[in-house]
A protein has these predicted regions:
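Short beta-strand segments
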Residues: 24-26, 76, 128-131, 161-165, ...
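Conserved core of the sugar-phosphate nucleotidyltransferase
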Residues: 139-241, 248-251, 271, 345-346
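Conserved N-terminal catalytic core of the sugar/cofactor nucleotidyltransferase
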Residues: 2-24, 32-39, 49-131, 135-141, ...
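Left-handed beta-helix
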Residues: 3-14, 223-369
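A residue-level structural signature of the nucleotidyltransferase/glycosyltransferase Rossmann-like core
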Residues: 74, 127, 194, 213, ...
């Protein structure tokens, strides 16, 4: 086969339909950013990079050029924070806000939103799913990458995910191994996905990096409604069939599964585009150091801090009048927000979720969640 001729034909096919519907996944709790992230103010409502915009607002602004306006932008979120979404995104049409009665992870969210957009715009509609709480640099590169993913998904039956080039052996991200190279879109190579691997140990992650074939799983996807609905019917009928039969009223009875587990690890239509834009999923407090570390300061200080023999600390206070004083501390996170002070070693921030379970089970502290 003449690959160049094949890719040229794909490009001609992809230009036939330009409607694109970005969907923002905004139902998460951001528990590992507690106590700053709480039930009444989850991570997506926060600004963590020093800007005036929340993560949700920044995500919407990034996607508006792709959506060609608010009328094509969608958000799916939980009933607990739906009003907060309305306040943060006042221009979002109410009909484009999908409100989950209970959280059922990303597979149910993707299935429901895809069904709704399919009803309104038909099976040829192109959809992209984007987490609300990620940090992305290089907006022009981001837009070009999504355009390439859309071009690929319009051209052939494909569920396209964006892979982030890893720059260190992270144990906190999932990995995607590239398989056969298809061709290039917008000068970006497209690969068939060989396999997904959930959060590996450090040695395995280092091996992945050395091969040059692996990228981080960004959690961003692009596809045509007809393709994803057909694949969900094949690989996740326990999610899509009840939604098709009963609608969102069945939500509490749906299984709680991620889209990676329910579909991406099973489908033969998964493709990956390695992305070149700066990215961080802001998974826990250590992400603040990756974003804001300055060479002339041994600590990351988002508070008034007086320190003696303190290095590698991340220090945050929501009240500018609070002063945090440290002596002889290395590699810690200190967060002061409202009526809570958190002190934790940087390598144990993943355990914050365990603390939240303790608080939830102890009736005295539910107001701290």
């Amino acid at each position: 086969m003449d690959v160049n001729l094949y890719c040229s034909a794909l490009g001609m096919l992809s230009s036939m339909n330009n409607l694109f519907f970005p969907v923002i996944l905004a139902g998460g709790k951001g528990e590992r950013f507690w106590p700053l992230s709480r039930l009444d103010r989850p991570k997506q409502f926060l600004s963590l990079d020093g800007s005036s915009q929340s993560l949700l607002q920044a995500t919407a602004d990034r996607l508006l050029p792709l959506a060609n306006g608010w009328q094509n932008l969608w958000v799916i979120t939980s009933s607990a924070i739906a009003q907060g979404v309305r306040e943060q995104l006042p221009d979002l049409p109410e009909s484009n806000l999908l409100i989950e009665s209970v959280g059922r992870d990303t597979a149910a969210a993707v299935a429901w939103a895809s069904l709704e957009i399919n009803k309104r715009y038909g099976e040829n509609a192109m959809i992209g799913f984007f987490p609300a709480d990620h940090w992305i640099a290089d907006p022009e590169v981001f837009l070009a990458t999504i355009s390439a993913a859309t071009e690929l998904a319009r051209s052939i039956p494909a569920i396209v995910t964006l892979g982030i080039k890893p720059n260190f052996p992270s144990t906190g991200y999932g990995y995607i191994e590239q398989g056969e190279n298809l061709c290039s879109f917008n000068n970006l190579p497209a690969y068939h996905v060989h396999r997904f691997t959930e959060k590996p140990d450090r040695e395995t992650a280092a091996t992945f990096l050395s091969t040059g074939r692996f990228s981080w799983n960004s959690g961003m996807f692009v596809f045509q409604t007809s393709v994803v609905l057909a694949e969900l019917r094949t690989h996740a009928p326990e999610i899509i069939q009840p939604l098709e039969q009963y609608g969102p009223d069945i939500y509490p009875q749906l299984p709680k599964k991620s889209i990676d587990y329910a579909l991406m690890e099973k489908t033969s239509l998964a493709y990956v585009l390695p992305a070149a834009f700066g990215w961080d999923d802001l998974g826990d407090w250590n992400a603040i150091e990756r974003l804001l570390k300055q060479e002339d300061n041994p600590n990351v200080e988002l508070a008034t801090h007086i320190g003696l023999d303190t290095q590698g600390a991340i220090i945050y206070a929501s009240n500018p009048d609070d002063v945090i004083v440290t002596i002889g501390l290395d590699d810690v996170v200190i967060v002061r927000d409202r009526n809570v002070t958190l002190v934790v070693k940087k390598d144990r921030t993943q355990e914050i979720k365990q603390i939240l379970k303790i608080l939830q089970n102890d009736g005295r502290f539910t107001d701290l969640l």
